[in-house]
Swiss-Prot record:
PROSITE patterns xref list: DNA_MISMATCH_REPAIR_1
NCBIfam families: mutl (TIGR00585)
The entry's keywords: DNA damage, DNA repair
Coiled coil segments of this chain: none
Name of this chain's protein: DNA mismatch repair protein MutL
GO biological process entries: mismatch repair
């Protein structure tokens, strides 16, 4: 078989397969062009889920008549001129493929007029032939009419889903773009019916209203605002408190320099930040905006531009984990901001404190101090209020300014102990335990290189490992919190992480899991009856404990019942 050059029509249709997957792909590419053209208002009209017609009109800069023909050709763009421009790209589009790819699989008409121009011009691509531009009445901006998508590629058209399904994909695309371009007005019509109208949002409240309309009221009610900058990176946006989770990762929006991305490194970093507070099988919700010097991120990874590649992935990962963990730590029980560290005005009588994490010492205990006279203080000074009684040695009943608070004693004490153990571990360090029989491991060349490069890391993680020949290592000591069983697999998994990602969190996760187990077993168990003073001390500890609203397994530690809620239940005032 001889090698032959593909004709332009075939080449364009193959290229279109990478850019135009479905009607939503067309909408994404065309709206991004409108945004790059500084449009303040973008209207999208859809017929039959986009298979029949997609019409996008904007009030942007418009296209010069002499550029109309070039606009429909492949690799023609106004965004970049040379390869070096990719190092500082700030526009959403830059590849010069969108219009050519769309016109290769549809009947496309483009009409545009620049500011101060006497008239607009229209150009069409019919049967793969670009027609000569002709004058046409048109307001400032550009209108692109795409009809009969995939009419010339029946196999692609067969794979389209129902109009309702395709329209939902289009809607999600517009919502994603609306979440990163608040000053732009967006209108979406389907079958001549208005579905979405996002007005320009120039204030914080306006932006929050747009987020609420997309992610929902419940998200905004539980959202924590975040703004964190460090070493040239900035993270802004909103993250949901750990108590608000989803069964699916459907409310996760991450933007890099204003561009929506799906990035495994970012997703894993954010999940790691929620690790201590996320219930098994649940997913966090967030809308976050990462700002980074364009020179440190490559967006030219895939034609859809959903994937990015960072020059220093570890730098970005560590920053994201630290930023989100810091924000989550501010969500103390009953409040949406950090409490003062001092609670001297109450002087709790019971100290819930762990014993040092060193070898040979036992579990945690309640250390009873000399009781102080209990006096009722003003309720609103403490978000969790003041203890009233205990129910069956399980739940603490408390009264605060809003009404009744019910606290799960075991879950609350478990979180308090866990956070104190983690803090003490960071201060005292890991205790190590010698293996009765050292473990010999044979490593491949990549694993040997990873081990030699990261010897200091293994030492910090609590391992004593030595070289044992050119391709072997011997493990002599390990963190005492980890059981010797499966240590070989753990070390190999860590080396695999270091080879693939140049970082690992496996050992830290195992150690935290061990601490969580210790805290769970050491915490007060039902039925256990406390005095009022002991209940008060537990409430005060909860208020100053990070993630005090959730136990180590992600379950809630307390529940608020407002007076109004109780009045409604008992039909008071009706």
């Amino acid at each position: 078989m001889y090698i032959r050059r593909l004709n332009d029509q075939t080449a364009n249709q193959i290229a279109a397969g990478e850019v135009v997957e479905r009607p939503a792909s067309v909408v994404k590419e065309l709206i991004e062009n409108s945004i790059d053209a500084h449009a303040s208002c973008i209207r999208v009209d859809i017929l039959q889920g986009g298979a029949k017609q997609i019409r996008i009109q904007d009030d942007g800069d418009g296209i010069h008549p002499e550029d109309l023909v070039l606009a429909l050709e492949r690799h023609a763009t106004s965004k970049i001129a040379k390869i070096d421009d990719l190092q500082d790209i700030t526009t959403l589009g830059f590849r010069g493929e969108a219009l050519a790819s769309i016109s290769a699989v549809s009947r496309l008409t483009l009409t545009s007029r620049q500011k101060n121009a006497e008239m607009g011009y229209r150009i069409s691509n019919i049967s793969h032939k670009i027609m000569t531009p002709v004058p046409a009445a048109h307001p400032q901006g550009t209108t692109i009419d795409v009809q009969d998508l995939f009419y010339n590629t029946p196999a692609r058209r067969k794979f389209l889903r129902s109009p309702a399904t395709e329209f939902q994909h289009i809607r999600r695309i517009i919502e994603r773009l609306a979440l990163s371009h608040f000053t732009t007005e967006f209108l979406l019509h389907h079958n001549e019916k208005e579905i979405i109208h996002f007005k320009s949002a120039t204030t914080i409240s306006g932006q929050e209203n747009r987020i609420k309309s997309i992610l929902g009221d419940v998200f905004m009610q539980s959202a924590l605002a975040i703004e964190f900058s460090q070493s040239g990176l900035t993270l802004k946006g909103y993250i949901a408190e750990a108590a608000y989770t989803r069964s699916q990762p459907d409310l996760q929006y991450i933007y890099v320099n204003g561009r929506f991305v799906r990035d495994k490194l970012i997703a894993q970093a954010l999940r790691q930040a929620y690790h201590d507070v996320l219930f098994h099988g649940r997913h966090p919700a967030y809308v976050l905006y990462l700002e980074i010097d364009p020179a440190f991120v490559d967006i030219n990874v895939h034609p859809t531009k959903h994937e990015v590649r960072f020059r220093d992935p570890q730098w970005v990962r560590d920053f994201l984990i630290h930023a989100v963990k810091t924000a989550l730590a501010q969500a103390k029980p009953g409040i949406a901001h950090p409490l003062p560290q001092s609670t001297a005005e109450y002087n709790p009588i019971t100290n819930f404190a762990p014993t040092p994490l060193i070898e040979g010492q036992g579990n945690l205990s309640l250390i009873q101090e000399q009781p102080a006279p209990y006096t009722q203080t003003i309720v609103h000074k403490h978000p969790l209020g003041h203890a009233l009684a205990q129910l069956q040695g399980i739940y603490i009943l408390s009264q605060n300014e809003k009404g009744l608070v019910i606290v799960d004693m075991h879950a609350a004490h478990e979180r308090i102990l866990y956070e104190k153990m983690k803090k003490q571990l960071a201060e005292v360090g890991l205790a190590m335990q010698s293996l009765l029989v050292p473990i010999n491991l044979s490593l491949n060349p990549q694993e040997i290189t990873a081990w030699q490069t990261n010897k200091a890391l293994f030492a910090r993680l609590g391992f004593e490992i030595e070289s044992f020949g050119p391709d072997k290592i011997v493990v002599r000591r390990h963190p005492s919190l980890l059981k010797p069983k499966n240590l070989e697999n753990l070390i190999r998994d860590v080396l695999a992480d270091l080879i693939t990602h140049n970082t690992t969190s496996r050992v830290g996760e195992r150690i935290n899991a061990a601490l969580a187990t210790l805290a769970c077993h050491a915490a007060l168990r039902a039925p256990h009856y406390l005095t009022i003073e002991e209940m008060e001390a537990l409430l005060r500890e909860m208020e100053k404990t990070e993630h005090g609203g959730l136990c180590n397994h992600g379950r809630p530690t307390w529940k608020q019942f407002d007076i109004a809620e109780l009045d409604t239940f008992f039909l008071r005032g009706q």
